[in-house]
From Swiss-Prot:
Species assigned in the record: Bacillus velezensis (strain DSM 23117 / BGSC 10A6 / LMG 26770 / FZB42) (Bacillus amyloliquefaciens subsp. plantarum)
Main location as per UniProt: membrane
NCBIfam families recorded: PRK02935.1
Transmembrane segments: 13-33, 41-61
Name this polypeptide is given: UPF0295 protein RBAM_008830
Similarity remark: Belongs to the UPF0295 family.
Keyword flag Kinase: no
Keywords noted in UniProt: Cell membrane, Membrane, Transmembrane, Transmembrane helix
A GO-annotated cellular component: plasma membrane
Family matches, as Pfam families: DUF2614
Subcellular location: Cell membrane
Length: 117
C-alpha cells in the first residue's frame, strides 16, 4: 500500500525542498568563481528557487486558512481537510466529508472532478 500524507503537508514538504534545492544550486555556483557569468547564473537560479518556495508557502498558507477543520475520529486531534478525501495530519487516518465515500478504501482519485469510482 502506498504511503499517503495530508495534502497540506505534501505541499509544505515541496516548498521546503525548493529551499534546499535553491541552496544547493547556489552552492554549486561557488565552484564557478572563475567565471563571473556562470557563478551569477547559479546564484540567480538558486535565488529564484528560494523565491518560488516563498510563493508556495504563501499560497499553502492562504489555502490552509480556507480548509475545513475536523476532529479525527482515530486520534481525536483537530486536522484540516482539502478536497473530498484527505488524511489526518497526525495519524494518517483517511478522512472524508462525503457521505457517499464513507467506508470505501482511500483513493486520492476521489478528489478529481471526473472520478468514476
Amino acid at each position: 500500500m502506498a504511503k499517503y500524507s495530508s495534502k497540506i503537508n505534501k505541499i509544505r514538504t515541496f516548498a521546503l525542498s525548493l529551499v534546499f534545492v535553491g541552496f544547493i544550486i547556489m552552492y554549486i555556483g561557488l565552484f564557478f568563481k572563475q567565471s563571473v557569468l556562470l557563478a551569477s547564473l547559479f546564484m540567480i537560479l538558486g535565488l529564484l528557487s528560494i523565491g518560488l518556495s516563498t510563493a508556495v508557502y504563501f499560497w499553502i498558507g492562504m489555502l490552509s486558512t480556507k480548509a475545513v477543520r475536523v476532529m479525527c475520529p482515530a486520534c481525536e486531534k483537530e486536522t484540516k481537510i482539502l478536497g473530498r478525501v484527505d488524511m489526518c495530519m497526525h495519524c494518517r487516518e483517511p478522512l472524508t466529508l462525503d457521505k457517499g465515500l464513507e467506508g470505501k478504501a482511500f483513493d486520492e482519485s476521489y478528489n478529481r472532478k471526473n472520478s468514476v469510482k
